[in-house]
């Protein structure tokens, strides 16, 4: 039997870090939303009791470093499954981009194996499993738009943001999330208005949503990687209504209210950046084709 799941990327409309916790994690408040840039995760049942992961993309790990592998092993062990599964990931989301590609692949494995092995687990139960392997996995199980708190595993769903386009550009650099958090001075940063962002979304107020964009990690990454700042500036110059870095970077996204401006921004960025995408925000997982 074979199951196919889509694994959409996410962007952070608001990302705040409150403090470092005794367990070593950071206490965060994030407004996240899924976009229609998605990997495809194909699950094929194996009679042999093993988990394999493969991809056409050589940068995708095929062992326990891959969150998709961890998700499958966790479900096998937790529910005593003696069968195996082959996982093939068709990567569309850029790797190590601040778009939760690995977390979304893992979430897709949880959803897919729930069907493949007929476990009848609820989405909330799958999200709780997700929290055991990664902070973003819980959100990715559900998708849509949500406020994430704690270390990112506590999810409260909110309204879908007002209608707009999202243009993304990823420079050809890697960013160490651990290093970004290490450099972050929580007591000295200006914290974004997370509640204001939620209000803007619920009011379907595009301009207010643009005004409330914020990411406390952005200034750290911009200092470490000036090319990210260059992409931000160019995206604004080409006409994006608002621009922000997603997660710890290096991907930058621009919100664009009118479709007529999207192609110009896309073409302008493609002049110097290979990985550029024009997409939409989506609601729950079932809104994906």
UniProtKB/Swiss-Prot annotation:
Its EC number is 2.7.1.148. It holds the Pfam family GHMP_kinases_N. Pathway: Isoprenoid biosynthesis; isopentenyl diphosphate biosynthesis via DXP pathway; isopentenyl diphosphate from 1-deoxy-D-xylulose 5-phosphate: step 3/6. GO terms for biological process: isopentenyl diphosphate biosynthetic process, methylerythritol 4-phosphate pathway; terpenoid biosynthetic process. It comes from the Bacteria. Disulfide bonds: none annotated. ATP binds at residues 94-104. One of its GO terms (molecular function) is ATP binding. Keywords: ATP-binding, Isoprene biosynthesis, Kinase, Nucleotide-binding, Transferase. It catalyses: 4-CDP-2-C-methyl-D-erythritol + ATP = 4-CDP-2-C-methyl-D-erythritol 2-phosphate + ADP + H(+). The active site is at 10, 136. Gene3D superfamilies: 3.30.230.10, GHMP kinase, C-terminal domain. Catalyzes the phosphorylation of the position 2 hydroxy group of 4-diphosphocytidyl-2C-methyl-D-erythritol. PANTHER family: 4-DIPHOSPHOCYTIDYL-2-C-METHYL-D-ERYTHRITOL KINASE, CHLOROPLASTIC. Belongs to the GHMP kinase family. IspE subfamily. This is 4-diphosphocytidyl-2-C-methyl-D-erythritol kinase. It comes from Bacillus licheniformis (strain ATCC 14580 / DSM 13 / JCM 2505 / CCUG 7422 / NBRC 12200 / NCIMB 9375 / NCTC 10341 / NRRL NRS-1264 / Gibson 46). The gene is ispE.
